[in-house]
């Protein structure tokens, strides 16, 4: 299995590598690399360890780099003699993916794309991926058995790009009906995904029933303890079955039976009952729809804790935890209940240490695995909960939200944080590490480094690692290149969380990407060090004669440049708005003209990047078997990266720095706002903000419905295009 990974990713020369699987022993996965007589030999305790050991060594000598953006492979004909030490990962499990990834990135993936991703996982030492595809096939069979008609099911499943939130109980029937062909295709796809993961010895995390039921089921069972939950982010309410109701265990057991019969028996089953929802505490569940989930960073409503005694709350939570565990255990006694720990950090108003302990206390320590995913956003949750009350847990970072793609990460933080974690005597049953991004295809250096750390790389110099990384990625390195990357690391790769993504209840990675508002004077702009990023860009451009033939050098240059330039556009937007608001029409016109010119250049520059609007829509339409389905998938795909849905704050949450989005979505929206501002400046009047917002909402919905075709337009000379763009955005 490991050899197959290496052949697919590194080419035919990988056939000469000698791979030897050996017993693991009592510890965690390990590998060891040696070379003699010109041949590379890798021994390891698992297929994943073999693949990762080979890749890690080849990257360290500059022979291979495999990333989402592309690969550079130059395996030598013969290897210098070498004998490495045995490398043992400090983590029993290396986890990967987020339930949201299946909406923000993978809804349109076919087997060829999934095969590449599973290969990437193996190369990076990952052995516990979340495997969420294909579950709607089982849910459909389950609800049919429990009497829900096909007509009602058609008004239950949400569109492909929104499926994760329907599965987690946040929404229901959004962008319904879901084509049956999509359900059938995902069933066949999951068969292949799980077969490959299991062949590699991975331990996929599979879905389980967490309590959410179709509205039609709730209406058909008025005597059941089914609670109407709160409306999440402006969507209509959903329905949750109390685990104390006898129906809960029947449904939960039957789901796992059907799932195992369909896809094979698993060990790890994910059930998140309260993803950005609060547990009903009142005996009759009447508080369920009144509670407001609170995320202070997102500026949403604060939690209103139920007016009940702590003892009643803790008893209720303990009952929930026990029932959720038992529903899985009865179906599969060997199973481990997996849950995300995001809720414990995101809503600390409700999830006090006492509440967390109550929820977990009735579950055997070895039968629950908590994915503590948000330590780059909500640090220290595990400490507040006494390491999750002695349960098994995996430490990790989300990093990416919504698949949005500003350039950021905090490499030194990941190194220092994991070093401190492993040295902490209070970590109890820490068993793993993982990256849990909501979306992929951005900042690949972050994930490359995270999984290096997962195999014990905390003691190595970050600068030395970056030197090896860039040599493998571009073909060679130099002091000048290392100096440029030192600046890049300080300027943008020392940013742990992208704070501008939420600003005054508006989502969007940059100001340009947010729905326009007239009061933007206090927008603080990009974190990090933009002047130092600009210096790094000059250094990279100076290296163009030496590196311009390296595709991944050109890719990275464009990525860093568009990030810097978009931040400059944000500042120019503020200048234009300020000028119009003070009545200086000429200055406003000049500032917005600079914005328009820069955005058009940005749109052209990013046309050669991996993912753009035309590729996203093309992948969506490629899933269709009929013209009607193609149009449906296209609308679904466009909605997610723009309006999202509901009447809350989710618009632009999945904003993208893509060709097509710059020129055809973000710029026209701001043009509407600037027209209103300019007219008010000319007339001496004021802008009706409410009317402007309504006009923008109508324009956004029209854009989603519009069938304008998009095609890829890559720049003929990316280096020259970067030079022109920087000259444009830095002009005064």
Where are these regions (language model features)?
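Soluble non-cytosolic domains of exported or imported proteins
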Residues: 44-48, 52, 108-112, 180, ...
């Amino acid at each position: 299995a490991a050899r197959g990974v290496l052949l697919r990713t590194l080419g035919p020369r990988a056939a000469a590598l000698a791979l030897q699987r050996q017993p693991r022993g009592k510890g965690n996965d390990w590998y060891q690399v040696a070379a003699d007589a010109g041949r590379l030999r890798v021994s390891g305790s698992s297929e994943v360890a073999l693949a990762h050991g080979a890749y890690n060594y080849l990257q360290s000598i500059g022979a291979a780099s495999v990333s989402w953006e592309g690969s550079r492979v130059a395996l030598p004909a013969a290897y210098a003699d070498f004998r490495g030490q045995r490398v043992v990962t400090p983590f029993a499990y290396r986890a990967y993916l987020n339930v949201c990834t299946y909406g923000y990135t993978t809804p349109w993936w076919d087997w060829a794309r999934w095969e590449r991703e599973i290969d990437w996982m193996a190369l990076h030492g990952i052995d516990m991926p979340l495997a969420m595809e294909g579950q709607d096939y089982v849910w459909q069979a389950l609800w049919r058995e429990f009497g829900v008609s096909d007509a009602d099911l058609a008004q239950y499943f949400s569109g492909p790009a929104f499926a994760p939130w329907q599965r987690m109980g946040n929404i229901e029937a959004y962008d319904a009906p879901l084509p049956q062909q999509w359900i059938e295709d995902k069933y066949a796809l999951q068969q292949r995904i799980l077969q490959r993961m299991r062949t590699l010895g991975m331990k996929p995390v599979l879905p389980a029933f967490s309590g959410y039921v179709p509205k039609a089921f709730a209406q058909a069972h008025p005597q059941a303890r089914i609670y109407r939950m709160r409306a999440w982010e402006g969507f209509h309410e959903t329905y949750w079955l109390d685990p104390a109701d006898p129906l809960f265990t029947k449904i939960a057991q039957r789901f796992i039976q059907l799932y195992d019969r369909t896809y094979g028996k698993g060990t790890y089953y994910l059930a998140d009952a309260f993803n950005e929802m609060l547990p009903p505490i009142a005996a009759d569940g009447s508080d369920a729809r009144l509670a407001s989930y609170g995320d202070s960073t997102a500026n949403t409503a604060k939690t209103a804790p139920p007016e009940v005694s702590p003892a009643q709350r803790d008893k209720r939570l303990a009952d929930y935890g026990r029932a959720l565990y038992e529903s899985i255990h009865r179906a599969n006694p060997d199973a481990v209940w997996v849950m995300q720990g995001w809720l414990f950090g995101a809503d600390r108003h409700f999830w006090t240490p006492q509440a967390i302990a109550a929820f977990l206390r009735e579950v055997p320590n070895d039968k629950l695995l908590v994915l503590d995913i948000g330590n780059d956003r909500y640090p220290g949750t595990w400490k507040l909960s006494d390491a999750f009350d002695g349960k098994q847990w995996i430490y990790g970072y989300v990093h990416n939200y919504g698949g949005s793609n500003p350039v950021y990460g905090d490499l030194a933080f990941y190194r220092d944080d994991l070093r401190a974690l492993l040295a902490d005597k209070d970590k109890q049953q820490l068993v793993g590490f993982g990256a849990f991004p909501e979306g992929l295809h951005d900042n690949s250096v972050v994930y490359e480094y995270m999984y290096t750390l997962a195999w014990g790389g905390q003691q190595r110099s970050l600068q030395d690692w970056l030197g090896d990384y860039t040599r493998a990625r571009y073909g060679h390195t130099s002091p000048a290149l290392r100096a440029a990357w030192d600046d890049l690391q300080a300027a943008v790769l020392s940013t742990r969380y992208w704070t501008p993504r939420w600003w005054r209840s508006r989502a969007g990675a940059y100001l340009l990407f947010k729905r326009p508002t007239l009061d933007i004077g206090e927008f603080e702009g990009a974190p990090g060090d933009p002047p130092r990023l600009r210096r790094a860009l000059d250094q990279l451009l100076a290296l163009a004669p030496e590196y311009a033939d390296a595709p991944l050098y050109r890719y990275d240059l464009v990525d860093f440049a568009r990030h810097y330039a978009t931040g400059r556009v944000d500042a120019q937007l503020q200048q234009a708005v300020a000028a119009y608001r003070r009545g200086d029409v000429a200055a406003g016109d000049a500032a917005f003209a600079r914005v328009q010119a820069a955005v058009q250049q940005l749109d052209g520059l990013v046309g050669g990047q991996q993912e753009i609007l035309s590729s996203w829509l093309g992948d969506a339409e490629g899933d269709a078997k009929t013209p009607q389905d193609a149009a449906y998938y296209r609308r679904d795909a466009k909605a997610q990266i723009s309006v999202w849905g509901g009447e809350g704050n989710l618009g632009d949450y999945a904003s993208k720095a893509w060709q097509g989005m710059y020129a055809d979505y973000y710029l026209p929206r701001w043009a509407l706002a600037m027209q209103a501002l300019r007219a008010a400046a000319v007339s001496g009047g004021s802008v009706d903000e409410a009317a402007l917002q309504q006009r923008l909402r109508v324009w956004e919905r029209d854009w989603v419905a519009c069938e304008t075709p998009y095609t890829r337009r890559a720049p003929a000379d990316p280096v020259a295009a970067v030079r022109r763009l920087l000259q444009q955005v830095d002009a005064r």
